[in-house]
């Protein structure tokens, strides 16, 4: 399949380890694709949960996926500053239908003041036992938590102000020319 181009809209689908669909985001504008990474933005996009519940995101969010890392990053742009929601997840794949990944439950939330919280450890442990996450998967995920925290602490990639400014401005340019 051809990679989506700048300005194209894609869906994002999150799955669980057992293959069940977890959550879908309907419209994310692609801002950049490379061999390994996808950067996009969505704003007031429809989200559908696995139980059929639907809701709409409240603010613009830049998304970052990379094929070499077991996490993805959502930077929510709010009046009080940027908050981040980071999912520990498989590297993404892209097909005709959507950008897809497996959500491995653990999340890191970063508040505008820099405070970090590791979330959903209980859910991770329960699903690890239920779906028999391998020792290798567990090792990879824990190593990627360390990489992620290092990126956060050092303002690397999506955690830098410049990144947010560049990509959110690009989104606004593209969105207003439609």
Curated annotation (Swiss-Prot):
S-S bridge residues: none
Binding site for Mg(2+) 1: 87, 103, 107
Pfam families: DUF402
Group of enzyme by EC: hydrolase
Cofactor: Mg(2+)
Active-site positions on this chain: 23
Catalyzed reaction equations: a ribonucleoside 5'-triphosphate + H2O = a ribonucleoside 5'-diphosphate + phosphate + H(+); a ribonucleoside 5'-diphosphate + H2O = a ribonucleoside 5'-phosphate + phosphate + H(+)
Keyword hit for NAD: no
Binding site for Mg(2+) 2: 105, 107, 120, 123
Keywords from the UniProt entry: Hydrolase, Magnesium, Metal-binding
EC number(s) from the headed UniProt entry: 3.6.1.15, 3.6.1.6
Keyword Magnesium annotated: yes
GO molecular function annotation: magnesium ion binding; nucleoside diphosphate phosphatase activity; ribonucleoside triphosphate phosphatase activity
Recorded family membership: Belongs to the Ntdp family.
Function: Has nucleoside phosphatase activity towards nucleoside triphosphates and nucleoside diphosphates.
NCBIfam families xrefs: PRK13662.1 (NF010183)
Protein name stated in the entry: Nucleoside triphosphate/diphosphate phosphatase
Taxonomic source organism: Latilactobacillus sakei subsp. sakei (strain 23K)
